[in-house]
Amino acid sequence: MSKDLDNRYYISLNKDKIIFSCLNKENKISFTMSHILKNGLNNLFEDLEKFFIENLIDIEKSLKDFIKKIYIIFDIDNSLSAHLSIKYKLETEKINENKINELLTYIKNQFNKYSNDQKVIHMTVIRVLIDGKEKDLSLIRETADNLILEVKLECLKNQTVHLIKKLCSNYQISIEKILLANHLRHSYLHQTDNIVFSANKFLSGTSNNEVFWTTKKPIKYGFFEKFFNFFN
């Protein structure tokens, strides 16, 4: 029987090592295994494949489970950050979740149009201005003249995302989500030393200003979730 409902499986990739971790339903790391990168990030994907070849069967035996889904945490410095903003004249329209979704989708699509070698991993709403005044979106139900959204996008190269998805698929493993360690550390500063616990907090929806995309029914991610859930 699969234990996917009880466990979350993570692979953290940094310049020194590959770390596999199993986080159980008590939010404790019940299993971990690491692999030293002798050449740093130069042969990262070759080393990850070697890790799977040499260890995957033993890991599954130890866990008494087949690993079908996994979360990948990139703890590397070659991600791209971009700050973007959009100003929208509302005229007689009221600000609502549909309009916010529409504007955030437009920002993401425009970024993809001009940076098509990048994959957006994280999108965060930095600031919302209504008629020049900073507002909390969760409380807005009003008519205004203009709305300004400021967002931060954090990205990886499309090629990097494609390669790791393909590699995992060779072992019948699907990637649930790719995360960036620097983003997690910024979101949960000083709360934990282990990046896996930060990732789990993030996936549980405790980051109120994060924009989430999902292909499934929306999951509640705090009071911002009705504004910031998207469908591919």
Name the predicted role of every residue range.
Residues 1-17, 25-30, 34-66, 74-232:
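Nucleotide/phosphate-binding catalytic cleft detector across ATP-hydrolyzing
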